Design a protein with these regions (language model features):
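Short beta-strand His + acidic residue motifs that chelate non-heme Fe in jelly-roll/DSBH
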Residues: 14, 32-33, 56-62
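Short acidic-glycine-tyrosine-enriched beta hairpin
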Residues: 6-7, 30, 36-53
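Histidine-centered catalytic micro-motifs
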Residues: 12-19, 54
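Short, conserved beta-strand element in jelly-roll/cupin
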Residues: 6, 17-32
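Short, surface-exposed secondary-structure edge patches
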Residues: 3, 13, 22, 38-40
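Structural recognition of the beta-strand scaffold that forms the well-ordered cores
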Residues: 14, 23-24, 49-50, 70
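A short glycine-rich, His/Asp/Glu-containing loop-to-beta-strand
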Residues: 1-14, 71
Length: 85
């Protein structure tokens, strides 16, 4: 499990996870872009499900800090995330 904090305008960069991700927006406004889909705008209380291998990016589009808590289903020894150009 991890918590990520993003300042206004900050983004995660495009990346993938080798396993599923389940996230929860604690605070702020998140723009979630999943490759091949229209961007989604999420707010505090919203839940994120990311399938394994999906290319995605999270960006803080609000005026305050964005806080997201996530848990991942990964095989032992696999990296948490892999950047995508």
């Amino acid at each position: 499990m991890s918590r990520s904090d993003f300042q206004p305008g900050a983004a995660s960069g495009r990346h993938t996870h080798p396993g599923e991700e389940l996230g929860y927006v604690l605070e702020g406004t998140l723009e979630l872009t999943i490759e091949g889909k229209a961007p989604q705008r999420l707010k505090a209380g919203d839940v994120i499900f990311m399938p394994a291998g999906a290319v995605h990016e999270a960006k803080n589009v609000g005026t305050g800090t964005l806080r997201v808590v996530s848990t991942y289903v990964l095989e032992v020894g696999k990296p948490l995330a892999t950047p995508v150009k």
